[in-house]
Amino acid sequence: MSDAKELKQVLTGPIVNNNPIALQVLGVCSALAVTSKLETALVMALALTAVTAFSNLFISMIRNHIPSSVRIIVQMTIIASLVIVVDQLLQAYAYQISKQLSVFVGLIITNCIVMGRAEAYAMKTPPMMSFMDGIGNGLGYGAILLAVGFVRELFGNGSLFGVQILHKISEGGWYQPNGLLLLPPSAFFLIGILIWIIRTYKPEQVEAKG
């Protein structure tokens, strides 16, 4: 029973209580770049979740056989291999989205969330818990990406997943899109607003002053 409770905590904790973007402020760079559309935000979230989960799993499985002096190199090799697999799958089955994501899929290799969970969690924890931790952190990352992507695409272009929701004036409708929301800096402010909302709801996440 305690194992099931711990597993649930590992899976759901990073979504709100210990969100990698909102609390730890990790992985922000890719969040700024890929959230102009919900479609790219979703694919990026799935890609990072897969890489984080499986890198955690594989690193945890061999953690007792990795010399401390080369552990970062081993972790990077495993993560890079998984990123290459994910990138090739995207190019094979979702080429247009792969083109839109551009270099940001490859940059998952250096994403702080993936590296951080491998070093801080997978190196010290059994495989199943490490795998679920990777999924949980991927879901936490994805939740922020989807929230930001929803606002940016809906109010920046009047659409969701490419389907027109708010009919634009240029097409005979009533809505004037806010072009600023399609620029990367808008994501920075939206993430800041989300962090403020979460920390207002959960004041224990606010850093102590002084």
Swiss-Prot record:
GO terms for cellular component: plasma membrane. Its main location: membrane. Its EC number is 7.2.1.1. It is an enzyme of class 7 (translocase). The chain crosses the membrane at residues 14-34, 42-62, 72-92, 103-123, 131-151, 178-198. It catalyses: a ubiquinone + n Na(+)(in) + NADH + H(+) = a ubiquinol + n Na(+)(out) + NAD(+). InterPro entries: NqrD (IPR011292), NqrDE/RnfAE (IPR003667). One of its GO terms (molecular function) is oxidoreductase activity, acting on NAD(P)H, quinone or similar compound as acceptor. One of its GO terms (biological process) is sodium ion transport. The keyword Nucleotide-binding does not apply. It is a multi-pass membrane protein. Keywords: Cell inner membrane, Cell membrane, Ion transport, Membrane, NAD, Sodium, Sodium transport, Translocase, Transmembrane, Transmembrane helix, Transport, Ubiquinone. It is found in: Cell inner membrane. PANTHER family: ELECTRON TRANSPORT COMPLEX PROTEIN RNFE, NA(+)-TRANSLOCATING NADH-QUINONE REDUCTASE SUBUNIT D. Composed of six subunits; NqrA, NqrB, NqrC, NqrD, NqrE and NqrF. NCBIfam families: nqrD (TIGR01939), PRK09292.1 (NF006777), PRK12405.1 (NF009070). NQR complex catalyzes the reduction of ubiquinone-1 to ubiquinol by two successive reactions, coupled with the transport of Na(+) ions from the cytoplasm to the periplasm. NqrA to NqrE are probably involved in the second step, the conversion of ubisemiquinone to ubiquinol. Belongs to the NqrDE/RnfAE family. This is Na(+)-translocating NADH-quinone reductase subunit D. It comes from Shewanella sp. (strain ANA-3). The lineage of its organism: Bacteria, Pseudomonadati, Pseudomonadota, Gammaproteobacteria, Alteromonadales. The gene is nqrD.
